[in-house]
A protein has these predicted regions:
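Beta-propeller folds
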Residues: 19-379
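Bacterial Sec-dependent N-terminal signal peptides
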Residues: 1-23
């Protein structure tokens, strides 16, 4: 009797295991599927003249392939080390144009097969739209001609989209400043195969500070090397006619922005030392203004590593912050400085002061206004 029962359980177990070998993902009944598997409404982007609308369509959910991609988490970034773009980006799968005063949607032709579109950016005169397309190997650059609704590829899959926008339009509307992977890009260190060369050492300054815990921080020297690797780019100028030229050699570029008159460009780079307790937004950085021949005009900001901050949601770092070009004049920077040393517990009449700094930056910045509370922005 015992033998028969044991045999029966064995046969049942074998039957269950065999029945599960070829199990695949199943679809729910149609009534449930209709509720869950719906088509998302497109996102809308309009030109400032209110002539065209760009309709961006996305999948309702990420695919299993999207969720199964490699991911590297360093310095607060989550990137795909194969394609060199954020692993959390939600891609656009189709683009259409529509005139504001019309009803017909115009399908944009020339889009890549199985589009994975991101980083949409209108040209300054709004006659072109640039975007990236992610392939299995990397990130490509496309440009749409709005008048004809035709997209064409400008660059193959070697853009670096790991940090910030991978490209910026020149104000002349015929060129783009593009971040490319370095020609001599080093391989990433595999922590499972490459042994560390020494211990991890942390030094305490003796200063009290209440820091929140951030995810995806750097943990060791291998992480530091890999972090520097993934954010290092070369800056190249690409014309819509296909010509190209190196603008700046490889560096850890965090951002680039042109002055409204198109004669200057402010380029921000990440500096060392890195930190194991705060993300890259608080790493040291340097902002330098260049002319269009890549000659440095002025170092306009140097931000130190900021691991210690005052308590409170209104706490900010000391020094210049939120530096950008004033959009209604030729080449003037606008930035903010805290008047309370960044500490909201300090009692002051004014928290922030906003400054204007006119190129070529030989004179001191001039005060625009002071705010009793923390400055948020000007429109």
């Amino acid at each position: 009797m015992t033998f028969k029962i044991t045999t029966l359980f064995f046969l049942l177990a074998v039957s269950i295991s065999f029945s599960q070998e070829n199990l695949t993902y199943q679809k729910p009944p149609k009534s449930i599927l209709d509720l869950a598997d719906y088509q998302r409404a497109p996102s809308v982007s309009m030109d400032t003249k209110k002539v065209y609308m760009l309709l961006s369509y996305r999948n309702t959910y990420k695919t299993l392939d999207d969720l199964n991609q490699d991911e590297l988490r360093l310095g607060g970034l989550r990137i795909n080390p194969i394609t060199n773009i954020s692993s959390s980006v939600t891609y656009i799968n189709n683009l259409k144009l529509r005139k504001i005063d019309g009803k017909d949607e115009i399908q944009i032709t020339g889009l890549p097969e199985n589009p994975k579109i991101a980083n949409l950016q209108w040209s300054p005169n709004e006659t072109k739209i640039a975007f990236t397309h992610t392939t299995q190997k990397g990130v490509q650059l496309y440009v749409i001609d709005v008048a004809t609704a035709v997209a064409s590829r400008l660059l193959n899959d070697n853009l670096n989209a790991n940090l910030g926008s991978p490209f910026s339009w020149y104000p002349n509307n015929s060129q783009l400043l593009v971040k490319l992977l370095p020609t001599n890009k080093a391989r990433l260190i595999d922590p499972k195969k490459d042994l560390p060369t020494g211990p991890i050492v942390s030094n305490a300054s003796g200063t009290k500070s209440q820091n929140r815990t951030y995810p995806d921080m750097l943990k060791n020297k291998s992480d530091e090397t890999n972090f520097e690797n993934i954010i290092t780019s070369e800056l190249h100028t690409y014309s819509l006619n296909g010509t190209a030229a190196l603008f700046k050699a490889a560096d850890m570029y965090a951002g680039q922005s042109f002055s409204p008159d198109g004669n200057l460009v402010m380029i921000t780079t990440i500096q060392k030392p890195f930190s194991y307790i705060v993300p890259l937004s608080r790493f040291p950085s340097t902002a330098i203004v260049y002319n269009l021949n890549a000659i440095a005009i002025k170092t306009v900001n140097q931000t130190p590593l900021t691991e210690i901050m005052p308590k409170g949601f209104m706490a900010v770092a000391k020094g210049k912050r939120n530096m950008s070009w004033r959009t209604d004049v030729a080449s003037t920077l606008v930035f903010t400085e805290a008047l309370d040393a960044g500490d909201p517990a300090t009692k002051v009449d004014f928290r922030d002061e906003i400054f204007l700094w006119k190129a070529p930056f030989v004179e001191n910045p001039t005060s625009l206004l002071k705010t009793p509370q923390r400055f948020g922005g000007i429109t």
